[in-house]
Amino acid sequence: IVMIDNCYCEFVATQEPLEVGADIIVGSLIKNLGGGIASNGAYVAGKKELVELVAERLTSPGQGKEVGPSGGANKMFLQGIYMAPNAVASSLKVAVLTSLAMEKLGFNVSPKWNSERADIVQTLIFNDRDKMIKYCQGIQQGSAIDSFALPIPTDMPGYDDEIIMASG
C-alpha cells in the first residue's frame, strides 16, 4: 500500500498522487485544500476498500463514512475548496519571489526559485537565530492581519526545538 500525506501539495503539480500510483492520500483542510478559511477537517481519498478502512477508524465503528462533518462545517469546507486553487497559486508566487529575493541577498534557499515544486513549502536557511527571529517579526509586522503581534520562539508540542511562526 502506498499512502501519501498530501498536506501542502494539493493543486501544485499537474497530477495528484492518486493519478500516478498512490493507493490512498490524506490531507488537512486547514492547509491548501481548505483555501485558508476551513478552520478544521481532513480528507481521505483513494481505493474504496482503503477509504472504508480509514473511515471506520476516524468515525464511529460500524458507521464509517456514513457520518461526517456537522454543525455547519460543510459550508466552510466547500468555500475553502472553491478558493483553494487561487490561494495555492498565490502561495506559489510568493514562495518563488521569496526564494529569488532571499537567494540574491545571500541566503541559502530550498527549493531554488526556478526549481519545479511539489508543494508550497519554501525553506530559508538563516544560520543565525537572531536574523531568523527578526525576519519572522518583519513578516508579521507587514501583514494585513495581526500586524501588532510579536512572534517569539517557544516550545510547541511535537517539536524538539523552539518554534516561531509568522502569518497574516
State each model region's role.
Residues 1-89, 93, 102, 106-110:
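Conserved PLP-enzyme active-site core in the AAT-like
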Residues 13, 21, 50, 54, ...:
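General structural feature for long, well-ordered alpha-helical segments within catalytic domains
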Residues 103-168:
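Conserved C-terminal alpha-helix-loop-beta "cap" of PLP-dependent enzymes
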